[in-house]
């Protein structure tokens, strides 16, 4: 991953416990640290803080107040712990004086929202997180509690508590706000061409013969498909001994339905379809799985013990066992994975969302050996 975590030094104004970064004429980074230690690592959100030569701006101090001014913004700050009374920013391009000034802590009432973490349990309208465009002319992204990337790509927690905000003061230049966000967070990767075609997915217990016959029927009717998404019944579900728990998580082919997985996937490839399998990783790797002996050895567990390999993406040994297992299935012909996580947002590392890290690790893994990366989540 190409990252530029350091803000150009010419765009940084700082004191003992505060730091302001001028990334663009409308985008500022605002930091407070009681210890005076600031974060210059890449976060899970911010991967590029160097936008090149900073825009022209001026600074001045009068009556104990710092003023930082760009062509688009005017910041006023009392150089003390951030407060509503001591930190404010005027967005020059917004004529409405009721909304053109942000004070630290203000609610984002005009925010036009961004994305949702997941559509699980959605039935109609759902709450969305704040985005970077707003009818008020400004928005704030709080990056204070986001985990960090280490130099080797591992994910680590922040060392020090503090405040780390990004102020988007683009007025009603919404496209410019999104463009600055893309520069900060990294450009969206290009999808492989086949992903833009028709996909087939149905929660139905297909046999391999039924599925291939369905693809042939689609072709005969002139309905083209480029992607076959196969739901959870590709693996053992009802045949799992209750002592292991449910069959929700599984990695062993159900050979009652799909007796020859390699042939089945090969048949789909011959028909021009890329194949994705559904996975629910929450229950880890249990003793009934074909891959259990290998995974147990990787974890230092005796395969004879039957002890489950618990799901824990903060453990490098589990990560290795987990992806070795997926690589073996890919050798059968699986092209990419449908990451179907529905079990909450907690890992053993504070601030690290299991769905986020699953998506990140699977996406990076899918890019190995020069492949064009893709996941469904």
Residue spans for each PLM region:
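A low-complexity, Ser/Thr/Gly/Pro-enriched, surface-exposed linker/loop concept
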Residues: 23-63
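Aromatic-lined carbohydrate-binding/catalytic grooves of carbohydrate-active enzymes
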Residues: 189-346
């Amino acid at each position: 991953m190409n990252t530029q975590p350091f803000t150009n030094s010419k765009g940084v104004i700082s004191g003992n416990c505060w730091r302001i970064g001028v990334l663009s004429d409308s985008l500022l980074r605002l930091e407070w640290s009681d210890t005076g230690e600031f974060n210059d690592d890449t976060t899970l959100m911010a991967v590029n803080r160097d936008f090149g030569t900073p825009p022209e701006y001026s600074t001045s101090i009068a009556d104990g107040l710092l003023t930082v001014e760009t062509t688009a913004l005017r910041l006023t700050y009392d150089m003390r712990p951030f407060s509503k009374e001591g930190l404010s920013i005027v967005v020059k391009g917004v004529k409405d004086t009721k909304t053109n000034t942000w004070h630290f802590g203000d609610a984002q009432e005009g925010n036009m929202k961004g994305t949702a973490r997941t559509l699980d349990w959605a039935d109609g309208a759902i709450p969305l997180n704040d985005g970077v465009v707003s009818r008020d002319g400004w928005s704030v992204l709080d990056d204070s509690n986001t985990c960090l990337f280490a130099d080797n790509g591992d994910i680590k927690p922040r060392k020090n508590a503090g405040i780390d905000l990004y102020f988007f003061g683009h007025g009603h230049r919404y496209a410019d706000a999104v463009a600055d966000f893309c520069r900060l967070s990294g450009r969206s990767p290009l999808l492989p061409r086949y992903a833009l075609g028709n996909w087939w997915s149905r929660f139905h217990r297909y046999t391999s013969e039924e599925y291939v016959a369905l693809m042939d029927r689609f072709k005969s009717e002139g309905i083209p498909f480029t992607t076959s998404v196969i739901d959870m019944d590709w693996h053992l579900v009802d045949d799992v001994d209750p002592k292991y728990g449910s069959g929700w998580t599984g990695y062993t082919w159900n050979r009652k339905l799909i007796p020859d997985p390699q042939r089945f996937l090969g048949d789909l490839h011959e028909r021009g379809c890329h194949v994705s399998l559904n996975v629910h990783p929450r229950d880890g790797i249990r003793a009934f799985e074909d891959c259990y002996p290998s995974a147990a050895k990787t974890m230092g567990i005796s395969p004879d013990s039957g002890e489950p390999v618990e799901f824990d993406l903060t453990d490098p040994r589990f990560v290795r066992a987990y992806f070795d297992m997926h690589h073996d299935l890919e050798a059968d012909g699986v092209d990419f994975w449908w990451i179907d996580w529905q079990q909450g947002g907690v890992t053993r590392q504070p601030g690290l969302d299991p769905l986020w890290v699953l998506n990140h690790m699977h996406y990076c893994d899918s890019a190995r050996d020069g492949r064009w990366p893709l996941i469904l989540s």
